[in-house]
A protein has these predicted regions:
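Alpha/beta-hydrolase-fold enzymes
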Residues: 70, 74, 88, 92-194
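Short, surface-exposed "cap/lid" segments of acyl-processing enzymes
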Residues: 1-43
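Alpha/beta-hydrolase active-site loop
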Residues: 50-72
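Short acidic, glycine/serine/threonine-rich loops at helix termini
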Residues: 13, 44-52, 90-93, 118-122
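Structured core elements
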Residues: 2, 34, 78-81, 88, ...
Length: 195
C-alpha cells in the first residue's frame, strides 16, 4: 500500500514508465495499491469540507489498509508513505496499534515529518499566530485551495521554483522545459479546512 500526500495527486511515484517506482515495485513481484485522495470542491455538498485529520485516518488510510488486506488475503501488509501521506500513515498505524491491531509487516516513510517540534524551514510559513488565524478562517469548514498550498511549497525553495521561472519566462521570454515532477507539483488538490 502506498499512501501519497493528500496535498498533491497520487501519481508522484508513477510519473512515467522510465521513472516509475510503482512499475519497479510491480516488476519486483509486489501487488501495488495506491491511494488516490479525493480533491474536495466548493460545489461538494456531502460535508467533505468539514473532514478532519481523524476522518482522513479512519476513512482514508485505515480503510485502504483494510481493502488491501481483503484483496491480498494477508493480515499484515507492507506500507509506504510519502510526505504528509507518511505522516497520515504513521498516525493511522499508531491509532491501529492503540486499538490492538497490527496490520503492517513493514513500514517505509519517504520525506515524512513525524516530529513537529523542529519543523525547519516550514517555520517561515507556519507559526502559532498563523495557525490560529487559519483555525478561525477554516476550522469549521471550507477549503484551502490547492493553488495556495502549491504557492507556499514553491516558496520553500524560491530560487529553483519561483525566481528561476520569473527570470526565464517573464524577463527572457523563454518557455519552461517540460518536466514531469513540476507538472505533478502544480497539480495540487484542495484540503478541507478542519483537516
Amino acid at each position: 500500500l502506498i499512501v501519497p500526500p493528500c496535498i498533491n495527486k497520487f501519481y508522484v511515484l508513477d510519473l512515467q514508465p522510465e521513472n516509475s517506482f510503482v512499475r519497479h515495485a510491480v516488476e519486483q513481484g509486489f501487488s501495488v495499491f495506491l491511494v488516490s485522495w479525493r480533491n474536495p470542491l466548493a460545489s461538494d455538498t456531502d460535508g467533505i469540507d468539514t473532514a478532519t485529520w481523524e476522518d482522513y485516518l479512519q476513512e482514508g488510510v485505515l480503510a485502504a489498509v483494510q481493502v488491501v488486506q481483503d484483496i491480498s488475503r494477508h493480515e499484515r501488509i507492507n506500507a509506504l508513505g510519502f510526505c504528509v501521506g507518511g505522516t497520515l500513515l504513521a498516525s493511522a498505524l499508531a491509532l491501529a496499534h492503540a486499538r490492538g491491531d497490527h496490520p503492517v509487516e513493514s513500514l517505509t516513510l519517504l520525506t515524512t515529518l513525524l516530529d513537529f517540534e523542529e519543523t525547519g524551514v516550514l517555520d517561515v510559513f507556519v507559526d502559532e499566530t498563523h495557525a490560529q488565524a487559519r483555525e478561525r478562517q477554516l476550522g469549521h469548514g471550507g477549503l484551502m485551495s490547492g493553488r495556495e498550498l502549491a504557492t507556499t511549497f514553491s516558496f520553500l525553495r524560491p530560487s529553483e521554483l519561483v525566481w528561476n521561472y520569473v527570470v526565464g519566462n517573464y524577463l527572457q521570454g523563454q518557455s519552461p522545459p517540460a518536466f514531469d515532477l513540476l507538472f505533478w507539483n502544480s497539480d495540487g488538490t484542495n484540503l478541507p479546512g478542519p483537516f
